[in-house]
Amino acid sequence: MSLLTEVETPIRSEWGCRCNDSSDPFVVAASIIGILHLILWILDRLFFKCIYRSFEHGLKRGPSTEGVPESMREEYRQEQQSAVDADDSHFVSIEL
């Protein structure tokens, strides 16, 4: 037997809830959270590519260098380049 048939029963010509505690604050909060979750899930599925494409490009840019002195930036670039150049016979790709 499904949960739907156990919770809701046909009353005259409409569907109604058998539970008397539908005004309970926890029931109302759970209903609101459930509806919001459903809406967010649908939006996530509809706009999946738009949402996650920005994350993908943002992460591939590398760490932020805002506020870092130029000498430290150059040192970081040299470390990354030396890691790539460690083995000249094979191409090494490092993504942060």
Swiss-Prot record:
Sequence positions bearing Phosphoserine: 64, 82, 93
A biological process term (GO) from this entry: symbiont-mediated suppression of host autophagy
Record GO cellular component, one term: membrane
Main location: virion
Description of activity control: The M2 protein from most influenza A strains is inhibited by amantadine and rimantadine, resulting in viral uncoating incapacity. Emergence of amantadine-resistant variants is usually rapid.
Cellular location(s): Virion membrane; Host apical cell membrane
Keyword Membrane: yes
Membrane topology classification: Single-pass type III membrane protein
Segments in the Virion surface topological domain: 1-22
Keywords: Disulfide bond, Glycoprotein, Host cell membrane, Host membrane, Host-virus interaction, Hydrogen ion transport, Inhibition of host autophagy by virus, Ion channel, Ion transport, Lipoprotein, Membrane, Palmitate, Phosphoprotein, Signal-anchor, Transmembrane, Transmembrane helix, Transport, Viral ion channel, Virion
Domain notes for this protein: Cytoplasmic tail plays an important role in virion assembly and morphogenesis.
Name under which the protein is recorded: Matrix protein 2
Organism this protein belongs to: Influenza A virus (strain A/Swine/Colorado/1/1977 H3N2)
Gene that produces this protein: M
